[in-house]
Every structure is written in C-alpha cells, then in structure tokens.
Curated annotation (Swiss-Prot):
Its EC number is 3.5.4.2. It comes from Brucella suis biovar 1 (strain 1330). InterPro entries: Adenine_deam, Adenine_deam_C, Amidohydro-rel, Metal-dep_hydrolase_composite, Metal_Hydrolase. This is Adenine deaminase. NCBIfam families: ade. It holds the Pfam family Amidohydro_1.
C-alpha cells in the first residue's frame, strides 16, 4: 500500500486541487470531516495546555481543532488525551531482528508513527542492495519510515565488512522521497583528519541533514566535528556531555535501547527550556523489550516517573524531533499537520489505545493490505568451519588484556588480568568472570579469526554466538570453552546466521536470522518468544547481563571506546590502533 508523504505527492494536479478544497471546507466546518475525534482533550505542545476540543481530519491531514465538528466517521475519545505521534529519530531496524514490515506492525500500535532509520547493518553485509531493500520497504509500510544513508560502511578499516560504500554508491539514493540525509558519521577521527572519502560524503550532503556519532568527543575537537555540518548526536551518556553538545548548537537525541540505556543519566537536561533541542531515539531495541516494556512510550513513562515534566518529554518525542530532521509537516495537534495521532489513557501512563497514521486508524487490516517486499541477503554467512584449536592462545604470558563489559552501556573498559597459562595457552578464569571472545570473518573475504578475553558476562560454561555484531556483522562468540565456541560458530553457518547458545557441544537455543544474518523471516511474535528462550538459555550458562546478545553485538565495534575486538585483532579505540593481548 503506497501512500503519499504530502497530500499532493503522486496525485494528479486536478486531484490535488480538489483535495485542497476538501481540506479547506472540512476545516472551516462547511462539510463533514472524514474523521472526527470527539469528547477528549489534546496536548497543545506550543502552550502546554490540555485543550477540550474535537479534532477534525481530512485525508491524511488534521484540518480542525479548537471547535466542534461533524464527521463522516466519529470516534469517541472521552476521558482520554490525544498527543502527536511519536518519532524515533535514530534506530537500526535490523536490531529488532525483524523486517521493516514486521517492525511496522510491532511498534506503530504503540504510537511510533515515524521512524528515522539508518540501514547500515544490512548495508555492511549487502551494500547498496540492502539500502534499496529498506527504501522499497519504506514505500509500503503504514508508518512513515524515513532513511538516512549509511555514511560509514565499514565503520573503520580495522575490520572486514561485506562491502565498502563510497560516495558514488550513495548518490543514486540521495533524491529518493524517503531519504532525509546522511546517517550517523561514526568515523569522527576521519572527519577531524579530513580523510578524503569522509570529506567527499560531507561535501555532497552539505545543506542536507547529517547525523552525528561522537561518544566522549569534547572541546575543540567537538567544534571541528560540528563545523563539518553535523547537526544531531545520540551518543551522550551523561548530562555534562549532553549539555556541551546542546550549548554548541547540536540537537541531542536521548537514547534508551535494549543495551544502551542513557535516559536516566540524561533526565536532568530534559526540561521545558531544553526540550526544543532534544529528541528521543532507541538506536537498538529488540521485540522482547518492546513487548515487555514498550518503545518510545516506555521512554516517556519512565521519564515522567523520574520527575521530568510531561510537556518536556512529549515535545522531545514529537515536535522537537520533527523540527530537528526537517519534518515540518508533523509533531503538533494543529490544522495542516499530518494526522499522526496517539490516543493515550493519560500523559503519565502513555498507553496507546488508538493510533492514527496519516489519518488512518491503525489496525491489522491496514498491515494485511501492504504490498510485500522480496527478501534479500540469503546465504550470506560464508565463514570457514572451525575447531577448538582455532581459538587457543599461543602466548606464553598470562598477562592479558580483557574487554570489560559495562552493563547497559556499549562503552567498554580496557582491563588487564594475569591469567593461567596451560597446555593450550592462556586459559579463561571463570572465578574472576574472564572468558574467551572470538571474532570470525563471515563474508568470505579472508577467513580471519581473532581471539581475546572479556570480563563481565558471568558465563560459567558453554558459549553464546551471534552474527549480529556491529557494524561489520562478523561472527562474534563468547565462551568458557574452545570446543563450545567452535560448535556455536559452526552452527551459525548452518542456519544462515542468527543467535546460538551452546553447552557441552549441544545447542540449547537458537534463532535463525536468514536475511543477511540480521533479520528473521518470521512474525515479531515468534521472534519475541525465540529471544525469550535464548535469554533464559544464556542465564542457564551463568549470564548476568539483562541483554547478553545485544551486549555481545557491540564488542566488535571499534568506534566506541575503549577496548574492542574485530576479526583483525584487539583495538584500543582511544588510540585507534591494534594492540596485543
């Protein structure tokens, strides 16, 4: 089902003129509106008032407020509050482990009417084909999915990705109606060093929206980064960092995902004064957390429960988000605005009871009417088969670096342990929560295998493995034994990628992700329950992490401080160089 992003788009001029006349007549009350929400109140994000009024809708637009209207179809919203649809300003749909169509069905009923996604997960595996898949899907979804073109594929050259996207690969998509601009520019060292390819991308998108990604970047270096035309940023993990970015003119996107949980730390800056320069995002959130907690509705509830003024958080969730990304047709309950509306039980509860997307009441019938999009990225896992011997350390020294997991953060610690050296090299120390980590190149490029150690998973036995491993999505495995690490890695090749939990050579739980090794072909309900089983299986191995698989997914991302591992080895992100074990 293809619908218009503006009421004139793709409509013959004569039809557009007629629609414009209908909107005027319905807004002026001369004709019954297509839909009228009656009996409730709406939140005016300009004044902060709760206004008792009908809301009249013609086609995909709000045409009337502050009045009484007749409607061809009237919906009683007595005792409830109408707010603008929520906008997720930065996310990777692939991290939900479902296709864009299933993501649409999963989160739109919870009030997320616009999602601004960066498809760089699938782009790292499939390149332009992956971006095209997302753009084709975005034309068919009920919610408005907008796409930022992936700016850093791969994130760095310290890992092996499936492809490399240069500026000439991105430009053919630049004028697509669903494209806003350039996605998170993760290679901030490249920006500051004026790397030629970085400069080519930045120059090509000057005047368009360029999203940022600059964890812990401060001072004059931050100034230089912003001066490149970068407007928004979602990596602030404390109020001090966020305030510096706000003071320097950036929009700060407050993030709360399944692993990166920054909302609590940033609550002090979510005020009515700052709200016009704030927005909300999830970055990476899986269907299990969406089902158990919610999506942006969860962020809103949590913020208000933590003392944030409702007006501030609702502004950040809609109108401020829309303005930050140039979507001036939405974000308010006002005439002329896109009819993206959420009927909630209360501002504090923020439980969506009715959702309208572009003037259509969201229902299973709407989802069923969508045109399907052909699958891509099958059989993308081309890793070599491995044995336990591939993961044995050759070092004679027990003094070893280890990646330190910080629960709820994707930043890691650069730790050092003195470990026992046995007949098969340096051994894990389960008493001190130090186990092995391995990254295996899976794109059929070179068969690289890198091993190291990690602290903080809590594993006492077995292994967990994934092909969701930002950003190049090689196989990443954490385990207490070399044999189980090998079994888990090999199983991922057999199921076209996904998640696996292994103990004593047996698979305890798994979830295939055959679309590029990132997304399931199943409904989100099936994915949700598979994730629940995987999480329980990981807990049975001793995992102490709330979200072990997404935590695992960021171990190999060498643009997030401090110590990471790619298929090429351990990376000291602060120095941006490889280091020995």
């Amino acid at each position: 089902m293809r619908h218009c992003d503006s009421f004139c788009e793709l409509i013959p001029m004569k039809g557009c003129e007629a629609m414009l006349e209908w909107m005027i007549d319905q807004g002026a009350g001369r004709e019954p509106a297509d839909i009228v929400l009656k009996g409730g109140r709406f939140l005016d994000l300009i004044t902060g008032e709760l206004v008792e009024s009908d809301i009249a809708i013609c086609e995909d637009r709000i045409v009337g407020t502050f009045g009484t209207y007749r409607g061809k179809h009237e919906i009683d919203v007595s005792g409830r509050i109408v707010v603008p649809g929520f906008i997720d300003t930065h996310l990777h749909i692939e991290s939900s482990q479902v296709t864009p169509h299933e993501f649409d069905r999963c989160v739109l009923p919870q009030g997320v009417t616009t999602a601004i996604c960066d498809p760089h997960e699938i782009a790292n595996v499939l390149g332009a084909e992956g971006i095209r898949f997302f753009l084709d899907s975005a034309l068919e979804t009920v919610m408005d999915i907008r796409v930022q073109l992936s700016s850093c594929v791969p994130a760095t050259h310290m890992e092996t990705s499936g492809v490399e996207l240069l500026i000439d690969d991105l430009l053919p998509f630049a004028d697509h109606p669903k494209v806003i601009g350039l996605a998170e520019f993760m290679n901030f060292p490249g920006v500051l060093a004026k790397d030629p390819e970085c400069m080519a991308k930045l120059r090509a998108f000057q005047g368009r929206h360029i999203d940022g990604h600059a964890p812990l970047l401060r001072g004059l270096d931050l100034n230089g980064y912003i001066a490149a035309g970068i407007r928004t940023e979602h990596e602030a993990t404390n109020a001090e960092e966020a305030l510096e970015k706000l003071r320097k003119g950036m929009y700060v996107l407050v993030r709360e995902g399944s692993v990166s949980k920054d909302l609590k730390a940033l609550m002090p800056i979510i005020t009515e004064r700052h709200a016009q320069f704030l927005a909300l995002c999830t970055d990476d959130r899986n269907p299990l957390d969406i089902a158990d907690q919610g999506h942006l509705d969860y962020l809103i509830r949590t913020a208000i429960a933590g003392g944030v003024e409702p007006l501030a958080i609702y502004r950040a969730a809609s109108v401020s988000a829309a303005r930050a990304f140039g979507l001036f047709d939405r974000g308010l309950v006002a005439p002329g605005q896109r009819a993206d509306l959420v009927v909630v039980d209360s501002l504090e509860g923020c439980h969506a009871e009715i959702v309208l997307s572009a003037g259509r009441v969201v229902s299973e019938a709407l989802f069923a009417a969508r045109k399907p999009v052909a699958e891509v990225g099958r059989n993308s896992v081309k890793a070599p088969r491995v044995t336990a011997s591939n993961f044995r350390s050759q070092s004679n020294s027990g003094k070893t670096r280890a990646i330190g997991i910080v629960p709820g953060k994707i930043i890691t610690q650069n730790l050092e342990f003195d470990l026992k050296v046995g007949p098969n090299g340096v051994e894990p120390d389960l008493e001190r929560d130090v186990v092995k980590v391995a990254v295996i190149e899976r794109h059929g490029k070179n068969g690289n295998i890198a091993t190291g150690f990690v602290h903080g998973f809590g594993l006492k036995a077995g292994a967990i493995a994934s092909t969701v491993s930002h950003d190049s999505h090689n196989i990443c495995v954490v385990g207490a034994s070399d044999e189980d690490i090998a079994t888990a890695a090999n199983r991922l090749g057999e199921i076209e990628g996904g998640f696996v939990v292994v103990r004593d050579g047996k698979v305890l739980a798994e979830m295939p992700l055959p679309i590029a090794g990132l997304m399931s072909t199943e409904p989100y309900e099936t994915v949700r329950e598979a994730l629940r089983k995987l999480r329980h299986a990981a807990e049975d191995l001793g995992s102490v992490l709330e979200e072990p698989f997404l935590q695992l997914a960021f171990i190999a991302l060498p643009v997030i401080p401090h110590l990471k591992i790619t298929d090429r080895g351990l990376v000291d992100v602060d120095k941006f160089e490889f280091v020995g074990n």
